């Protein structure tokens, strides 16, 4: 019984620490969205989408998942035009990009609390995410693998 009490107490302490980080971060992200910062990021990342073989419209999906969560990015993705040409290769590249960069502000703050430098974490996650997606896209283009259109 004592072990359950310790585990419960520890769980609440960890949850409290996460809420202290998550709630202010989400508020800041929402404020940045309201003042148009997300739109600036979308325009900034549009050329990157081209480099990764993705349509420009995907920059909104990328920015949303990077600043909030993969689920929010998928909601934005589901709102894209159904007639937008999209291949299985592009879906794979987008999925990999989201896996590397999702929830970046929250996770960087949590890593910083654990002793990891924020800049290093941002560089590693964004840099390796972009590099991995670039090479994955290059593989798909060179081999012609998974280039068939999919229906969103």
Briefly describe each language-model feature range.
Residues 42-100:
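Membrane-interfacial helix-loop connectors
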Residues 25-36, 135-143:
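Structural signal for alpha-helical transmembrane segments and their membrane-water exit/capping regions
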Residues 21, 25, 29, 42, ...:
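Alpha-helical transmembrane segments in multi-pass membrane proteins
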Residues 150-152:
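Conserved small/polar residues in nucleotide/adenosyl-binding loops
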Residues 21, 25-28, 38, 73-77, ...:
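Alpha-helical transmembrane segments of polytopic integral membrane proteins
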Residues 4-15, 37-52, 114:
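Hydrophobic alpha-helical segments of integral membrane proteins
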